[in-house]
Amino acid sequence: MAAPGEALTPSGYITHHLTNLSTYKLGLVAEESSFWNVHIDSLFFSWFTGLIFLGIFYAVARKTTAGVPGKLQCAVEMIVEFVATNVKDTFHGRNPLIAPLALTIFCWVFLMNLMDLVPIDFLPYPAEHWLGIPYLKVVPSADVNITMAMALGVFALMIYYSIKVKGLGGFARELALHPFNHWTMIPFNLLIEVVSLLAKPLSLGMRLFGNMFAGEVVFILCAAMLPWYLQWMGSLPWAIFHILVILIQAFVFMMLTIVYMSMAHEDSDH
């Protein structure tokens, strides 16, 4: 499937499938670099996977019984226990919101990553030919805007709890007097600490984006370079391996969030 007016070449196929449905592509904004150039497909599928997460957990919570649990309830309980154990082992403060935050991040990122296993043309083809939607990327976590938005959300919480727990003065002292506790080293300390602080959301968001984008490119290459009846030969082995990537990236994002929240709750004199 190629963009309108573009020859069905491997390069055109790849370019088409790496293009988001955006307000610029729909002619709603004049410039592609505009702040209001929104990736509609990424937002839709991130909301869609979020609703799936909420729907499953809400349904299980309503039907939870003290007797023999069903398979879905067992799966949900295992996930909750897994996340709770990691929070207990890693987070050393007292905040009842950290466990729900970690659970939400793990499940949401996992579901967004899981969209990478949907066959390349399964949704874009009918979207273009039946609904007239020219572009459609179904993996939200392969969009740097989504991953960086989540990372910046975690960063905002980190700053908020750092100031709340340590006080504005304590937070400032932590930046100015660490690692060298002398006033003459304040400029050097600030340089190190500010760069380290800003690197946290950048690495958090870019790590997830890089891994998922690379996985998506491999699937697209398999679809572009092979005839349709042989695509499974290239995609299946990668899909089996990619299941591990999907899980690991969701776990890493969750664990780093817990670690950052724990650092934010540490006393400034710790």
Curated annotation (Swiss-Prot):
<dbReference type="GO" id="GO:0042777">
    <property type="term" value="P:proton motive force-driven plasma membrane ATP synthesis"/>
</dbReference>
<keyword id="KW-0138">CF(0)</keyword>
<dbReference type="GO" id="GO:0045259">
    <property type="term" value="C:proton-transporting ATP synthase complex"/>
</dbReference>
<dbReference type="Pfam" id="PF00119">
    <property type="entry name" value="ATP-synt_A"/>
</dbReference>
<dbReference type="InterPro" id="IPR045082">
    <property type="entry name" value="ATP_syn_F0_a_bact/chloroplast"/>
</dbReference>
<keyword id="KW-1003">Cell membrane</keyword>
<keyword id="KW-0066">ATP synthesis</keyword>
<dbReference type="InterPro" id="IPR035908">
    <property type="entry name" value="F0_ATP_A_sf"/>
</dbReference>
<comment type="similarity">
    <text>Belongs to the ATPase A chain family.</text>
</comment>
<feature type="transmembrane region" description="Helical">
    <location>
        <begin position="98"/>
        <end position="118"/>
    </location>
</feature>
<keyword id="KW-1133">Transmembrane helix</keyword>
<dbReference type="InterPro" id="IPR000568">
    <property type="entry name" value="ATP_synth_F0_asu"/>
</dbReference>
<keyword id="KW-0472">Membrane</keyword>
<feature type="transmembrane region" description="Helical">
    <location>
        <begin position="40"/>
        <end position="60"/>
    </location>
</feature>
<feature type="transmembrane region" description="Helical">
    <location>
        <begin position="208"/>
        <end position="228"/>
    </location>
</feature>
<keyword id="KW-0375">Hydrogen ion transport</keyword>
<feature type="transmembrane region" description="Helical">
    <location>
        <begin position="143"/>
        <end position="163"/>
    </location>
</feature>
<keyword id="KW-0406">Ion transport</keyword>
<comment type="function">
    <text>Key component of the proton channel; it plays a direct role in the translocation of protons across the membrane.</text>
</comment>
<keyword id="KW-0812">Transmembrane</keyword>
<keyword id="KW-0813">Transport</keyword>
<dbReference type="GO" id="GO:0046933">
    <property type="term" value="F:proton-transporting ATP synthase activity, rotational mechanism"/>
</dbReference>
<dbReference type="GO" id="GO:0005886">
    <property type="term" value="C:plasma membrane"/>
</dbReference>
<keyword id="KW-0997">Cell inner membrane</keyword>
<protein>
    <recommendedName>
        <fullName>ATP synthase subunit a</fullName>
    </recommendedName>
</protein>
<dbReference type="InterPro" id="IPR023011">
    <property type="entry name" value="ATP_synth_F0_asu_AS"/>
</dbReference>
<feature type="transmembrane region" description="Helical">
    <location>
        <begin position="239"/>
        <end position="259"/>
    </location>
</feature>
<comment type="subunit">
    <text>F-type ATPases have 2 components, CF(1) - the catalytic core - and CF(0) - the membrane proton channel. CF(1) has five subunits: alpha(3), beta(3), gamma(1), delta(1), epsilon(1). CF(0) has three main subunits: a(1), b(2) and c(9-12). The alpha and beta chains form an alternating ring which encloses part of the gamma chain. CF(1) is attached to CF(0) by a central stalk formed by the gamma and epsilon chains, while a peripheral stalk is formed by the delta and b chains.</text>
</comment>
